[in-house]
A protein has these predicted regions:
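Local sequence-structure signature of Cys/Sec-based thiol-disulfide redox active-site neighborhoods
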Residues: 1-35
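Thiol/selenol-based redox catalytic cores and closely related redox-interacting motifs
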Residues: 37-111
Length: 111
């Protein structure tokens, strides 16, 4: 499996955990964006997310899956955005789906 796009923040615990699982499973990343250098606000995040077939968000043990065609933009962005108003890291795009946040069980199952 190859991840098309990854939004990662170096030194961030959840990003380190995500990278460790991906490395363990030999999952490559085509393009990596440094979240410390390139901020993605709500409008830019929606531009990325609105065309996805599915968006899975993870906050701790809570995992939710959204469909941008049928679920409310506000509900999706509430889960996808961090407290600073930028897209949460890690955020991964695999084909036409996004995974935002880190949950070990989710990563073990999906990758």
């Amino acid at each position: 499996m190859k991840i098309d796009w990854a939004y990662l923040r170096k030194g961030w615990k959840s990003c380190q955990n995500a990278q460790a699982v991906l490395d363990e499973k030999h999952v490559g990343i085509k393009t990596t964006v440094d979240a410390r250098k390139q901020r993605i606000d709500a409008d830019a995040a929606w531009e990325l997310l609105q065309s996805a077939a599915s968006i899975t968000t993870a906050k701790g043990k809570k995992v939710q899956t959204f469909n941008p065609e049928s679920d409310a933009k506000a509900d999706i962005l509430k889960q996808a955005m961090g407290p600073t108003g930028n897209l949460r890291a890690p955020a991964l795009r695999i084909k036409d789906s996004f995974v935002i946040g880190f949950n070990k069980e989710l990563y073990e199952k999906d990758f």
